[in-house]
A protein has these predicted regions:
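Conserved SAM-binding strand-loop segment of SAM-dependent methyltransferases
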Residues: 117-129
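A short SAM/SAH-binding and catalytic strip from SAM-dependent methyltransferases
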Residues: 140-152
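Conserved SAM-binding loop
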Residues: 108-109
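Conserved SAM-binding loop and adjacent beta-strand
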Residues: 41-61
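Conserved SAM/SAH-binding beta-strand->alpha-helix loop
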Residues: 101-103
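Conserved SAM-binding loop of SAM-dependent methyltransferases across substrates and taxa
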Residues: 79-91
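A short acidic, Gly/Pro-enriched loop at the edge of an enzyme's catalytic core
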Residues: 129-141
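A short glycine-rich, Lys/Arg-flanked "PGG" loop and its adjoining helix->strand segment in the class I
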Residues: 154-166
């Protein structure tokens, strides 16, 4: 695209070759609002997000030493894939997911139905702006591919710090 005021010509563009990840991202955004998935399109979007975030989530979680008795919060839990992966390691602890999309909460609960039914996990509808937990509740807090959706990052990080135990770990 020219910025010199002469307009655009066909020769100004070259054919673009998209990677699989770029195509997946384009499909996500064409199907609705990734910030707050809604309706049937939102459910499909969450399924694709679970798939497209798989590798980065695995890498990020590999940086943590998850203990069996950890109490972990996943902010912006989306379709619940990260919670599911952490549930493999948390045996005596507890996992909590929170998302402000009701479709995300519903999908995450379905993805993790066994852990939810066993009382090992709960998934709540809520916002990072006002986390419904006591101070110093969680050993670890994670957010996967959702920080850029937070409405007021500086204030929201203070809220994360409030519910994170002293010496706890926040994985962003």
């Amino acid at each position: 695209c020219r910025l010199d005021g002469r307009g655009m010509e066909e020769n100004d563009f070259e054919e673009r070759h998209f990677t699989e990840a770029e195509r997946a991202q384009a499909e996500i955004t064409e199907s609705g609002n990734p910030r707050k998935p809604e309706g049937e399109d939102g459910k499909k979007m969450l399924e694709r997000m679970n798939e497209s975030h798989h590798n980065v989530t695995g890498w990020a979680l590999s940086l943590w030493e998850i203990q069996g008795n950890d109490n972990i919060l996943d902010i912006g839990c989306g379709g619940g894939a990260a919670l599911s992966r952490m549930a493999e390691h948390v045996t005596d602890g507890h996992l909590t997911g929170i998302d402000y999309s009701s479709v995300s909460v519903e999908t995450s609960r379905a993805t993790n139905a066994e852990s939810v039914a066993a009382g090992k996990m709960e998934i709540l509808e809520g916002s990072v702006e006002n986390l419904p937990f006591e101070a110093e509740t969680f050993d670890k807090i994670v957010t996967v591919e959702s920080f850029y959706f937070w409405p007021n990052p500086q204030e929201n990080l203070k809220e994360v710090r409030r519910v994170l135990k002293t010496g706890g770990t926040f994985l962003l």
